[in-house]
Swiss-Prot record:
Ligand binding (nitrite): H65
Protein name: Myoglobin
Entry-annotated residues carrying Phosphothreonine: T68
Keywords: Cytoplasm, Heme, Iron, Metal-binding, Muscle protein, Oxidoreductase, Oxygen transport, Phosphoprotein, Transport
GO biological process: removal of superoxide radicals
CC annotations in GO: extracellular exosome; sarcoplasm
GO molecular function terms attached to this record: heme binding; metal ion binding; nitrite reductase activity; oxygen binding; oxygen carrier activity; peroxidase activity
One Pfam family it belongs to: Globin
Residues that coordinate or bind O2: H65
Residues covered by the Globin domain: 2-148
Major localisation: cytoplasm
Lineage of producing organism: Eukaryota, Metazoa, Chordata, Craniata, Vertebrata
Source organism: Sciurus vulgaris (Eurasian red squirrel)
Binding site for heme b: H94
Length: 154
């Protein structure tokens, strides 16, 4: 299920564009996640009170958390599948502290793909979308395996 070198190049090329405005991308990803899957908002005590898209856009905390999420994901993507050291603490915190189900990781993966499609259509064609989908699936599968080791049925 690994990616080819060419697929990793496509992933990292578009990710460079994400990193140029990580806060903006992170904010958009979280807003899309919360709009498309409102149940995910319940996992975020800090954001539960944000009811409208305008409130979400005005939240510095949401923008900051979006940067944190995409920053961590970027670090994982740059490892090109050799991300054991990065995945382990992330799975630990998301299983034991935050209790984030794998399904929610699927939801945020969808949000990432949609945001990249809307912001970078010229650099995110079918090949790049397919490569990013595979990379995010690899990430989710590895998180799910760690969840299982930890006894979390997320």
């Amino acid at each position: 299920m690994g990616l080819s070198d060419g697929e990793w190049q496509l992933v990292l090329k578009v990710w460079g564009k994400v990193e140029a405005d990580i806060a903006g991308h992170g904010q958009e990803v979280l807003i899309r996640l919360f709009k498309d899957h409102p149940e995910t908002l319940e996992k975020f005590d800090k954001f539960k009170n944000l009811k409208t898209e305008d409130e979400m856009k005005a939240s510095e905390d949401l923008k900051k958390h979006g940067s944190t999420v995409l920053g961590a994901l970027g670090g994982i993507l740059k490892k090109k599948g050799q991300h054991e050291a990065e995945i382990k603490p992330l799975a630990q915190s998301h299983a034991t502290k935050h209790k984030i189900p794998v399904k929610y990781l699927e939801f945020i993966s969808e949000a990432i793909i949609q945001v990249l499609k809307s912001k970078h259509s010229g650099d995110f064609g079918a090949d790049a979308q397919g490569a990013m989908s595979k990379a995010l699936e690899l990430f989710r599968n590895d998180i799910a395996a760690k969840y299982k080791e930890l006894g979390f049925q997320g």
